[in-house]
Amino acid sequence: MKAHYRSFAVTQRGVSATILLAALVVAAVVAVALTALLVNIFERKQEAKVTTTRLVEVTRDDTDPAKWGVNWPKQYDAYKLTAQATRTRFGGHGGSEALPQQKIDKDPWLKRMFLGYAFSIDYRDRRGHAFMLQDQENTQRQTKPQTGSCLHCHASIMPLYRELGGGDAMKGFEATYQMSYKDLNKKLHDMGHAQPVSCPDCHDPKTMQLIVTRPAFLVGIQKLAASDTPTPFAPSIERWRAAGKKVAYDPNVEATRGEMRTFVCAQCHIEYYCSSAMPLTVPWGKGLSADQTEVFWNETKMPDGGRFFDYKHAETGAPILKAQHPEFELWSQGVHARSGVACADCHMPYARDGATKVSDHWVRSPLLNISRACQGCHK
């Protein structure tokens, strides 16, 4: 009997030892796994703190994006993808040909509607930002005299404006409408700045903060701010008004980062008037709606004192107002603006790169990137 109890006790001790050993092994595995997880989290947090490694110094006069790409390779690689042909059922260029198809060949009524305007000569589907200067240089519209103001939004032109204005970009800008496109474009090439929209057009080279640089936009947004038109899409303007309008509204000082994610696009994706008759003009003095824009143009006079018009129809002689591409104006009146959604949220949505979050610099239609551009909200 004693032998039986002794054997049972030994067996129990063996089982207890096995359980204890198994528990120790499990605890060790869990401890190792938790340690690895915590180390990974720590490393990711440290990685997220280092958003860039500056290998070269860049300035506002470095218009070649390749130089910026040394410091910010992910953004540069994405920017280069704007050279790819993309198309949705609403527009774009998805073909393999050198130039997009002529819209005036596909829809001949456009040619007649634009008679007296250069769009009756050449009007094609759009391509990406990478081609914005090249396509402008090669368009058949150049067979007619064009103003230097056309380069305002098709080139990284700020260094040239500063050169022409003796260091004052606004003065340089105001001088270019009287110059021919051919002459101004030659100066751009001679200075080595013949680049499409580039990094310093939207980023401060020292801080990488978003900035707006285009003179016509700055003049236009100041006129909008000085008006009495409500601007729920731009709360910084409302705050500036409430503070007493002590100095001219400056989006680079007053605007939030969220607003700037729209304003950098609104430098060019807007309604405007561009000709050799007057400096490039943005019609926001009365507001951004179509009716308010019409009031602004109706109160605007041509240099000879006559009624403002974009062009006179060659067949009927009727003065025509032609809307350009008022995307910012349309956005400002829509549900996305009311919801605080910026242009970049949909056209340059955030993407994960390791532990860091970056804006996708492949600027394109949200319909080509629905999972990140749309489904963050529309689920």
Set out the residue ranges of the language-model regions.
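Hydrophobic alpha-helical positions that pack around
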Residues: M1
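Primarily the internal scaffold of c-type cytochrome electron-transfer domains
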Residues: Y5-F8, S16-A27, A33-I121, E163-P200, ...
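Aromatic/pi-system hotspot detector in well-structured domains
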Residues: H129-L133, H154, H203, H269
